[in-house]
């Protein structure tokens, strides 16, 4: 192990000098430094980011640099940060370095570990399947279905329900799927991670789940690399065990945000809106590894925060290019009390073709979108002149569109404690059948309010009956 000395500490950036004759550590190598805290030696991991010349390197700390001083000895480990992989990770909670943070016993020193930096699978190793992943959420299954082994992005501004939707997907898919799941919390609230951990523990899903967290209070180095830690654990199950893995990431924007902080600290010239010039490269390196190969599949569901609800912001715009399906959450729908607040016209999926979902499903989905689009066009006329100016056919269409809009809402299992209503899981065939009947006008006389926050059409009729219809 070659060793050097700290020459400068500026926040999470630490400069280390190895001397002009010494062997310099490679980029992305992990360095170790021990700091003295009240007589106890504490290990801090640094990752090499730049070579400055004259035997010096600039590193990013993965933990707080409080207590580091100039002159402290730094050791080069000779390899990248590596984290535990395999069966032993299931049911456990880790940080970016693969250290256990759930209060349980540490991993043995000889546990199998993999480096967090590796190349994406080659072109000939990739595999594409065209099987729909049923979520039990009507608006998703009908209008923007997910693919097994595909990549899904949940886009939305602050407070429109991304994390609740991802938790419902964990509830519905992880419990039905029965396979292995990896949840990665990137720069989000610790409270949400804690809630999710206890929910998973109560439901028993934790036994088949590995959880990795680098939350809001962590230094930018940890937030930037924690997504790679979760991905490394998922890749092992895919490549070595040939498993079909579910990878949940909340939130990809925080990965970009941390990269932006690190880039500024390293002195790189910012690009558009102050983001790092390497934004597309960093996103590509992460996203290209999240893929399905001939050995196994990774189905990833990623929450992506949209700053100020601006979809043209470089961070969400860069992520768009990598996804098979997008679920767009809309603030206007939350204001109408429609949850999940999924925009049925803006959400998209490459799975919505007759070859993949079938002719009937495709036709019903297209007709639902046509009715909603026409309703959107008529809203200006209604706002200015009122409903009376519409033709009879248009009045019928508006009534159906409003019923469809409300019927796209649904009660969630994970929101039961807030709504007081039990959650509902609707099979995809039932969803298609129910929307087809609404489009045919079978429920034109049922009050609109009966369609809010329900599961299948039977719930609507029961609700209408209780309302005295």
Curated annotation (Swiss-Prot):
Q: Which GO terms describe its cellular component?
A: plasma membrane; proton-transporting ATP synthase complex
* Pfam families listed in its UniProt record: ATP-synt_ab, ATP-synt_ab_N, ATP-synt_VA_C
Check the record and name the InterPro entries matching this protein: AAA+_ATPase, ATP-synt_VA_C, ATP_synth_F1_bsu, ATPase_a/bsu_AS, ATPase_alpha/beta_chains, ATPase_F1/V1/A1_a/bsu_N, ATPase_F1/V1/A1_a/bsu_N_sf, ATPase_F1/V1/A1_a/bsu_nucl-bd
Annotated residues for binding of ATP: 156-163
Reaction(s) this enzyme catalyzes, per UniProt:
ATP + H2O + 4 H(+)(in) = ADP + phosphate + 5 H(+)(out)
Q: Does the keyword DNA damage apply?
A: no
Could you say which EC number(s) this protein's record lists? 7.1.2.2
Describe its function. Produces ATP from ADP in the presence of a proton gradient across the membrane. The catalytic sites are hosted primarily by the beta subunits.
| Protein name stated in the entry | ATP synthase subunit beta
Q: Which organism is it from?
A: Lactococcus lactis subsp. cremoris (strain MG1363)
Q: Quick one: which gene encodes this? A: atpD
């Amino acid at each position: 192990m070659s060793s050097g000395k700290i020459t400068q500490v500026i926040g999470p950036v630490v400069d280390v000098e190895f001397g002009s004759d010494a062997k310099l550590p490679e980029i992305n190598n992990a360095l170790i430094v021990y700091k003295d805290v009240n007589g106890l030696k504490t290990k801090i991991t640094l990752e090499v980011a730049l070579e400055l010349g004259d035997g010096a390197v600039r590193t990013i700390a993965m933990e707080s640099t409080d207590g580091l001083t100039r002159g402290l000895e730094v050791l080069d480990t000779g390899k990248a940060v590596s984290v535990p992989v395999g069966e032993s990770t299931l049911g456990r909670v880790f940080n970016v370095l693969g250290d256990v943070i759930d209060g349980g016993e540490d991993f043995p020193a000889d546990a199998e570990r993999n480096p967090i930096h590796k190349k994406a699978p080659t072109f000939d190793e990739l595999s594409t399947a065209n099987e729909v992943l049923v979520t039990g959420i009507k608006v998703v299954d009908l209008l923007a279905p997910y693919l097994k082994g595909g990549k899904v992005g949940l886009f939305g501004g602050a407070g429109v329900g991304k994390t609740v939707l991802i938790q419902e997907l964990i509830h519905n898919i992880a419990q039905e799927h029965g396979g292995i799941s990896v949840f990665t919390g990137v720069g989000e609230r610790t409270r949400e991670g804690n809630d999710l951990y206890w929910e998973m523990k109560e439901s028993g899903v934790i036994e088949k789940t590995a959880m990795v967290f680098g939350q809001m209070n962590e230094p930018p180095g940890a937030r930037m690399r924690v997504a790679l830690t979760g991905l490394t654990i998922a890749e092992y199950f895919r490549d070595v065990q040939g498993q079909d893995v579910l990878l949940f990431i909340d939130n990809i924007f925080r990965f970009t945000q941390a990269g932006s902080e690190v880039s500024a600290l390293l002195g790189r010239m910012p690009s558009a809106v102050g983001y790092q010039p390497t934004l597309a490269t960093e996103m590509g390196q992460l996203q290209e590894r999240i893929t399905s190969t001939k050995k196994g599949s990774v189905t990833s569901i990623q929450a992506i925060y949209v700053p100020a609800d601006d979809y043209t912001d470089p961070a969400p715009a860069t992520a768009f290019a990598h996804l098979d399906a997008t679920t767009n959450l809309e603030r206007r729908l939350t204001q109408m009390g429609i949850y999940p607040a999924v925009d049925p016209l803006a959400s998209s999926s490459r799975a919505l073709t007759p070859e993949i979902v079938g002719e009937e499903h495709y036709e019903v989905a297209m007709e639902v979108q046509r009715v909603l689009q026409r309703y959107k066009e008529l809203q200006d006329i209604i706002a200015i002149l009122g409903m009376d100016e519409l033709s009879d056919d248009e009045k019928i269409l508006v009534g159906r569109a409003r019923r469809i809009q409300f019927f796209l809402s649904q009660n969630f299992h994970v929101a039961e404690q807030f709504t007081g209503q039990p959650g509902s899981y609707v099979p995809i065939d039932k969803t298609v059948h129910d929307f087809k009947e609404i489009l045919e006008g079978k429920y034109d006389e049922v009050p609109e309010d009966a369609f809010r926050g329900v599961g299948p059409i039977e719930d609507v009729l029961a609700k209408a009956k209780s309302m005295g219809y």
